[in-house]
Amino acid sequence: YDRHNGKVINQITKGQWYVREVLHVDEEQRVIYFSANGMVPNEDPYLLRYYRIHFDGSGLTCLTPEEGMHQATFSADRKYFVDVYSLAHKAPVAILKEAEQGKVVMPLETANISELTKAGWRAPEVFCAKGRDGQTDMWGIIVRPTNFDPNKKYPVIEYIYAGPGSHYTPKSFLAYN
């Protein structure tokens, strides 16, 4: 938008996905850094990723292409960022990346969950089912007890919020699932 008259200069992004947050506007390089979700087909649309794009809408670049829920922390000069990502059923990974193209500078850490597994922790089961319309994907997880017996019956807690643009199903790794 033109800040003086409020008119649209050009649309920067478009598509069937959501810009969640504008993280930084680099006026000198004419680039915007932002987080978004819903851009990867056949993937849970609530998984957050980070992107950069030029003011004119060209050069859209995914900085965090690895499958997962991402959390990026940028350096003060915005040349690098630490990307920590995971899924409800996959342990966190931390990597250092450069911010221009998202290239990996170096891996930092991968969580070791062997002690959790030894203690009986079971990863949640991620699933996708069709909604009532037969077309809409509904993503969720099944969390089973550590001492799960498939021959027993268990109570089920179904926690659902069917509103737009929000989710309450854990998307990232939580050791207490």
Predicted feature descriptions by range:
Residues 3-6, 54-58, 99-101:
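Short loop/turn segments that connect beta-strands within beta-propeller blades
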Residues 6-9, 22-24:
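Long, ordered, helix-rich scaffold segments
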